[in-house]
Amino acid sequence: MTDGILGKAATMEIPIHGNGEARQLPEDDGLEQDLQQVMVSGPNLNETSIVSGGYGGSGDGLIPTGSGRHPSHSTTPSGPGDEVARGIAGEKFDIVKKWGINTYKCTKQLLSERFGRGSRTVDLELELQIELLRETKRKYESVLQLGRALTAHLYSLLQTQHALGDAFADLSQKSPELQEEFGYNAETQKLLCKNGETLLGAVNFFVSSINTLVTKTMEDTLMTVKQYEAARLEYDAYRTDLEELSLGPRDAGTRGRLESAQATFQAHRDKYEKLRGDVAIKLKFLEENKIKVMHKQLLLFHNAVSAYFAGNQKQLEQTLQQFNIKLRPPGAEKPSWLEEQ
């Protein structure tokens, strides 16, 4: 059966231009990524080496000088080490063989789906939720990028206001005729710096929470989605293989292969259904967690920004207390991990 499969693979036609280069199809980029994902699960053979060649063979045979008519051949008996090496080599060969067959079947199924010659299992509701998650993640990544830009601008503004306040304070000491004017401008800049530091703390907390939601929670769910999609491809590949065997002639050899294909198909079906259930559960919990986190963070962001631009220092400080945000004093070092526990 394997020889037949490899024979088909060897005769696959690839469209070629007149200049000898393979023709690029519109979906080549996506297809290449999918093929890389299929090939990435190859076996790791670096732990032990595969032993090849003869086992227990003799070196240079010694023929004794005597009256014997028949020369005696020196042979080295196989030791325990040779048996272990044979076992390791056999296991590695089986791993490579199974991986090669699985990769071929999945690649064949992927190409059949891409070129419209094969069928695929589709859970419309689940795939819609997965696509919605990917779109939501892209939008949240955009919000995260803008939030980081706002943090950088606020920090730069604080540095400028602090320097301007120091300059006004210095000039108030050196210009008696303008001492009062420079003085209250210096106090204004200092107050703006204090409120700005409070706002910066709130925005940093907002950005940190969004970052955790995007890079940890959403990414964890998408990793399970990738496992589900790989299991779906394997399930369809072995389903197609079973259907082709079922349509063939029924003899003693075919019945054995059919039973083996049925068992393999059932194993991949169980794996696919389990991962489909895992994805559905993670999507549900992710949605609940996202709503809970964003409700809190959007309220914090609104209250802090509104209080800052209204010049309401008391409300700004109350906002940070409401969300248990503690500001580090200027120049303070970051606490150690032990202090944060």
Swiss-Prot record:
Originating organism: Homo sapiens (Human)
Binding partners and assembly: Forms homodimers or heterodimers with ARFIP1. Interacts with RAC1. Specifically binds to GTP-bound ARF1 and ARF6, but binds to RAC1.GTP and RAC1.GDP with similar affinities. Interacts with ARL1. Interacts (via N-terminus) with IKBKB and IKBKG; these interactions inhibit activation of NF-kappa-B.
Keyword line: Autophagy, Golgi apparatus, Membrane, Phosphoprotein
CDD domains: BAR_Arfaptin
GO cellular component, one term: cytosol
PANTHER family (UniProt xref): ARFAPTIN-2 (PTHR12141:SF3), ARFAPTIN-RELATED (PTHR12141)
Domain AH, residue spans: 121-321
Top-rank lineage group of the source organism: Eukaryota
Protein name from the UniProt record: Arfaptin-2
